[in-house]
Amino acid sequence: MDLQNLRKDFKVLNKSTGNAQFYRFTSPKSKEYPYMIEIFSRNPDFIILEDDAVLTPLPIDDEISSLSAILLNEAYYELLKNGQMMVDGIPVLSLTCLIPFKAKAWLDLKERKLNGEQVDSKNIKKHKNDVFRLTQLITANTRQALSPEIAEDMKKFLSEIADETVDLKSLGIRGTDKKKMTEMLYQCYGLKDNP
């Protein structure tokens, strides 16, 4: 699938700003396509620029120049690559690997908002709620190894979420509470200093 088809067959607008975003494509016109396609990349290690390097922009179509990717550091890129599973021939991220991405997004958006950046509070809340929606799908025996960096991010998320209100009932989650769910995450990811 090329950029022209992605633009034609998927929505490319950012919900909060209304601007086109060319790293996430949602709401396909055809039910044969996945609900969402996101483009990820890692920081290329083969491009090393000198401090005094001069970059020259290439003249290309305006919309094509907007094609972008969510840039991941090496630890998250490895989790993305190693955590894939195939569903109907489409690579998707496994449940236990998706949760740390949602937790990291929550941490990053929350920090950006605290630093005065324009961040939609609904997006922050969505990522927090997504963590709990996904957590209800894991079992007490589910385990996922994490790199030290991602494990630290998960610990930070779990520590900060302790002070947050999470309305499990409105998320359709019953028969448990936030404390039990966070304990399950500590277990799942082998985060030893469980409070």
Positions of predicted regions on the chain:
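Compositionally biased terminal segments of proteins
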Residues: 1-195
